[in-house]
């Protein structure tokens, strides 16, 4: 389906895109006139453009024009050398001739070689009425459609702008959070050094405790030895006491005699 655009958009597209070919399309009206429109084909475009031209009388056969079947009761179309030329839109550039080469010569397709330079336009299957054309044009994009698209683009642009501001604010927040993380990292590093120093102190204290335990163990062994000696001395004292008691008894016996 060709895409319908405005004359202004067509002129802009003609300046920015390379035009490849065009053909004239006619639609039969009830008053015997044809509605002529030029269908342009552009390079690197996935659609064609129909540019409306003013109403023209019935057109006979020509290189780029095909004559359709006559409607019953309609006037006969002239068929002869005196063919009226197609009316041209003043804003529409003439694309029937290609760009001139160096030296002022035209591309092939001039009067010396009429069989070259133009692509043959296929004959339309049938002519359509105004109503049928309007039904088909409903599928084409209109100025209102372009306006809606422009509005959507404006909304998307504003949305992207707002999102860009939000991303900028979030970037500042992330940057501030990064600084906080760096400060926390330094604090954790200092605390780690302190914990490491405390660990060294605890390790030294543990070594001291081990040495004290060893000394306590040695003192315990000495205490045990002293207890054994005290026990032995106690037994010796008991023997001495018993000996003294026996000696006292003997003395008493001797005195009584």
Curated annotation (Swiss-Prot):
Residues 80-104, 115-132 have a biased composition (Basic and acidic residues). Residues 49-132 are annotated as: Disordered. Signal peptide: none annotated. Belongs to the UPF0134 family. Coiled coil: none annotated. It comes from Mycoplasma pneumoniae (strain ATCC 29342 / M129 / Subtype 1). This is UPF0134 protein MPN_013.
